Structure formats: C-alpha cells, structure tokens
Amino acid sequence: MHFPLVSAWNKRRRSKSYDTDPCTFLFSIIFARWHKRVYRTAECWQIEDQASQPRKRRFGSSVYTLKEMEEATSSFSDENLLGKGGFGRVYQGTLKTGEVVAIKKMDLPTFKKADGEREFRVEVDILSRLDHPNLVSLIGYCADGKHRFLVYEYMQNGNLQDHLNGIKEAKISWPIRLRIALGAAKGLAYLHSSSSVGIPIVHRDFKSTNVLLDSNYNAKISDFGLAKLMPEGKDTCVTARVLGTFGYFDPEYTSTGKLTLQSDIYAFGVVLLELLTGRRAVDLTQGPNEQNLVLQVRNILNDRKKLRKVIDVELPRNSYSMEAITMFADLASRCIRIESKERPSVMDCVKELQLIIYTNSKGGLGGTIPTFRRL
C-alpha cells in the first residue's frame, strides 16, 4: 500500500518539535522509511495561478481555489453558516458539480495561526488517507495564500451534542443512540487498529460535537486536527502539551503527559454518559458541584436504583430495557476509570455495544438485531 509523505510544514518545524514532542520525531522517521522522496517546499500547498490551473489532487483529495470556496458559500453568507468552532466557521456549500458539502473556514487571530496551520496540515495529511463508513470524508481543501479551507461531506443531521441538549428540537430515541455509540466505536476501532496508515492513530479530541450524523443518523467521527500517530511498536506517546477539550480529558494524560489509545476510550466513555443522561460533559450553567458530568454520575453508574434518576427524561420509557441501560452504564463506568489499564479496548466496546443492542431489541424495544461481522 502506498503511503504519502507528511507535509513539508513538518520538516520546517522539526528542529523545534523534536525537543518538545518525541511523537513528532518518530512520526517523521516512520514516514521517511516508507518513502525515499524528498520533502517538497511548503509553497506546494498553495496553488499558483489558481484561476488557470486544472483541478489538482493531493492524496485523493481535491484542491480548490478561494474563488470556488466563495462561490460555493455565496461569499460565506450567514444563511449558509452551520456553526462556529475554536479554529473557524463551518458553512454549507454547493460545489460546481452540485454536490452539497460542509466547508470549514480557518479563521484565527495572529497568536494562534501556528496552531491553526498545524491542525490544517494534520487534518489533510491524515484524513485524506482514511476510508471508513464511520469517519467523515475529506473531499478536498484550499490553501490559497493565507486562506485555509477544509471541504467535507455534508452531514444532514449535524452533531450529536445538538440532538442531546442543543438546538435540535427532536430528541433521538434510545435505539438510535445505541446505534450512534456503536458506529462511533467502530470508527475509533479503525483508527486504533493501525489498518489505515500502518500504525495506530489517537484521535485526541473525541467528543459529542465531533460525532456527526448523516440523514439516517449514522455516526461519523470528524475533526482530526489534534490526531496523533503512535510511535511504531509503542503504546505510549509523551507530549509537551496536553491538547483536547475540557470535560473529555483522560486524567492520566493530563497528569503525566502520556498519551495512549486509552485516552480516546476515556473520552468515548464521556460521550456514552451524554447519550445516557442527555447532559453535557461540562455545563457551566450549573452550580460548581454539578458542572462536570463524570463527577456527577461516576459513583452511581453501578447502582441500579440510583441509575434510574440520571436516565435522560426525554427517553420514552417503552424505548429501553433496564437490562440494556444497566449494561450500557457499566460499559461507560469502565471507560472512564482513572487508570487507563483498567479501561476496555475499543474492540471490547464494539462487542459489548452489539450485545447491548441485541439485549434491548429482545423486548421489542426498537432496533434490529445487529449483524456480527468484522469491521
């Protein structure tokens, strides 16, 4: 299998990165061993005379011009605005082919430009090599002068958090929540299995806003700007900075700086709690002792009587069985254990969620018996 080289941007930064982030050093070595090509200059990311150039592709992703991005979004009209994030805004757009897409416009203050550029490079480098039904597809990108855009497949039902406690009026049912959890677990399993690029990938920013839903509520993981390739033959990566989102941080990672695949499992467990309770991972509108979801429910997940009190009140009682709820809560409780070695693997999560779906469906409470097959 052919694996493309990491961007020249990494080479320009490697003299600094090696001192602060051993993973970046190992990452470069691994890819250099796969390739004998030399690094191209960073300017190769930009498109010279874009208006007159034919469509180019990088690793299977289309390259677009700034003009095409403006035309696709009606000059970034507020009517096409889908949402805002830490590194810019996301717009709905329509390409010349008629395809509806989501376009992330990277828009950063000067002091954050280096971080934004890094995330842009990582996302294009990694996501354009991945292919799985539970990962959002990168259609293309634009690197025109100082402008940076990422073009994704359009996900009609937005992100998971909006359906649980956000702007979406219709709340998703328990069987659909189980299916979403299973789909997300399969996406993580693909990343962790090393089948995509030869070595495992840690997402590092798994959360409910990064679980997108298509028209049939199939889950797809998005936003790979903080993703890390694990060092070859290693299960731990020491990083200089702890990156991610508050509320989803692996406690072991924050205290030691050691990033592992199990860091994603902790975040996955937090999302399971969101699916179960309908609450946010962190809710700053609540009192100081009620803001953090994990701290609120950790000690009652294995108490069947108390567990009933935290089940999302939006869930119809006839949509779930307490047996399935109990199994689901038990899985979540093991995912959020303090010590990473005590957490289940992502494949264990996949298998248990398949069993939970089957258990819930036995009582005729929605859903179908899942097909047990290899990912």
From Swiss-Prot:
Spell out the molecular function terms from Gene Ontology: ATP binding; protein serine kinase activity; protein serine/threonine kinase activity; transcription cis-regulatory region binding
Active-site residues are D205 (proton acceptor)
Which cell locations does it reside in?
Cell membrane
| Annotated signal sequence range | none
GO cellular component assignments: plasma membrane
| Pfam families tied to this protein | Pkinase
Record: residues binding ATP = L82, G83, K84, G85, G86, F87, G88, R89, V90, K104
- Enzyme Commission number: 2.7.11.1
Any single biological process term in GO: defense response
Residues with the modification Phosphothreonine, per the entry, are: T65, T245
The reaction(s) annotated as catalysed by this protein in its Swiss-Prot or TrEMBL entry are: L-seryl-[protein] + ATP = O-phospho-L-seryl-[protein] + ADP + H(+); L-threonyl-[protein] + ATP = O-phospho-L-threonyl-[protein] + ADP + H(+)
Primary place of residence?
membrane
Which UniProt keywords are given for this protein, alphabetically ordered? ATP-binding, Cell membrane, Kinase, Membrane, Nucleotide-binding, Phosphoprotein, Plant defense, Serine/threonine-protein kinase, Transferase
Residues with Phosphotyrosine modification: Y152, Y253
Cite the Protein kinase domain residue spans from the record: 76-356
Q: Which InterPro entries match?
A: Kinase-like_dom_sf, Prot_kinase_dom, Protein_kinase_ATP_BS, Ser/Thr_kinase_AS
Query: Is Aminoacyl-tRNA synthetase a UniProt keyword of this protein?
Result: no
**What is the protein's known function?**
May be involved in plant defense signaling.
Family to which this protein belongs: Belongs to the protein kinase superfamily. Ser/Thr protein kinase family.
According to UniProt, the name of this protein is Probable serine/threonine-protein kinase PBL28
Lineage of the species this protein comes from: Eukaryota, Viridiplantae, Streptophyta, Embryophyta, Tracheophyta
Q: Gene name on record?
A: PBL28
